[in-house]
Regions:
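Bacterial N-terminal signal peptides that target proteins for export
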Residues: 6, 11, 20-35
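Extracytoplasmic cell-surface/polysaccharide-interacting catalytic and binding patches
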Residues: 46-119, 123-222, 230-243
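N-terminal acidic, proline/glycine-rich, low-complexity intrinsically disordered segments
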Residues: 2-3
Length: 243
């Protein structure tokens, strides 16, 4: 244990016991010296992985955005947690995270909050989608693609063998409590952004697109929830696990 960590503890109380022969302190001794907050700070590096250089955790910039990271659990079209998502966190490239934080600030000022379903997506997750498309398991078909053959999901543009999400510039999102006509990842023409001709859901889609456009994001026309920060070119895709 480096001496300065003990000397800088809030209580500045000396340890009641010396370290053992291997230089280890007992937990209760550390608790006396550092306090609960100090122990949390010492443990923090082991609790969360770091985003790649040039990326940020959205929670650090926009804590008001709800995070329902679907691919970290089984509530998604594959029916299982997806490789690459060891933690349910939204990582984005810093410029995209800042732009999304600005969109959330405008949303909050107008009385609503954004919710994200997917952000940066490791390449291994995209590869897992490809593998899933080739198996015979269709248990999620009624909920996610009732009107599309599984092998047609790529051809119809709902899943891609290379994803903009892997660059950290794309985000899937909605608004908490708003009706958008179809759920997230519902692969059907009804999910096309301009498919609805009337009703509250059509207006909500238009409002979301307008909000995101004001902050630099373009919508993918076949998915009302999918937005990509415009302007960036030749951006590297990544395969760092989210943890």
């Amino acid at each position: 244990m480096p001496r300065n960590l003990i000397d800088s503890a809030p209580s500045r109380r000396a340890l009641a016991h010396m370290p053992d022969r291997r230089g280890r302190f007992r937990l209760r001794d550390l608790a006396r010296a550092c306090g609960v907050a100090g122990l949390a700070a010492l443990a923090a590096p082991a609790l969360a992985g770091e985003p790649p250089p040039g990326f940020a955790r959205l929670s650090d910039l926009a804590p008001g955005v709800a995070q329902e990271m679907r691919y970290a659990g089984s509530n998604n079209f594959t029916g299982a947690p997806v490789p690459g998502y060891r933690a349910a966190q939204c990582w984005l490239r810093l410029d995209a995270a800042r732009a999304l934080a600005a969109a959330q600030a405008e949303a909050r000022a107008k009385g609503f909050d954004l919710v994200v379903y997917d952000c940066y997506r490791p390449r291994r997750a995209v590869a897992a989608f490809v593998d899933w498309s080739k198996n015979d398991d269709e248990k999620t078909k009624p909920a996610y693609y009732p009107n599309v053959a599984k092998h047609e999901l790529f051809a119809q543009g709902y899943i891609a063998e290379q994803s903009g999400h892997s660059t950290g510039l794309a985000v899937d999102l909605g608004v908490k409590g708003w009706d958008f006509g179809t759920p997230f990842d519902f692969f059907d023409r009804r999910s096309w952004t301009g498919a609805l001709k009337r009703g509250v859901a059509r207006l909500n889609r238009a409002r979301l697109v307008a909000l995101m456009r004001r902050h630099g994001f373009d919508n993918y026309p076949r998915e009302w929830w999918h937005f990509t920060l415009r302007g960036a070119k030749n951006v590297e895709s990544r395969d760092v696990e989210i943890e």
